[in-house]
Amino acid sequence: MDHASSTVELNPISEEDLPFWKELLAQQETREHQPLQERTEEELRQHLKRYTEHNLGHPHHREYKWVVIDAESLERVGEVSFDKLDIGQKIGRIGYSVHPQCWRKGFGTAAVGAMVDKIFNKSDCQRIEAECSIHNSASSRVLEKNGFTREGTKRGYLEIHGVRVDHYSFGLLKEDWEKQR
């Protein structure tokens, strides 16, 4: 699949990205469909320690996070993450957030596409999973545009703002991704 990877760059998250990350989490719209909460820079600095190794092929490292950069303006527009859920079975899960000022400009689709390409090209992952609130149609479209298949509904999957919310479950197999390229 030819993603608009030229529209975004994925840079490993670093200390200099903390103000942007803090600002992203402070946006009410960012947290509308996700169980995210505002954090101080110090809390984010501690959280950042989990993401210091960015070699996707590392056999034991499980968590990765990148900042999404608009390749034209070089501004930060979002973040994406990848967690190895089951190293033995080669299954991972992705997450992503785009700053509300950058919505409806293709950054989410491009960022997820670039991340999927990176994961399948640089790791032994064979399956990527993702979930999104059933109320977040934009996120569903981002996943579907990148070849993910909606596989079901997880009832009461996450608590968001004190309410259990159903989520769609999506999956993408490496073999399907290779056919779409």
State the predicted function of each range:
Residues T52-V67:
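A short helix-loop-beta-strand connector motif used in the catalytic cores of GNAT acetyltransferases and
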Residues L25, Q34, N55-P59:
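Hydrophobic residues in alpha-helical segments
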Residues M1-P19, E23-E32, K65-R181:
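Acyl-donor (CoA/ACP) binding surface of acyl/acetyltransferases
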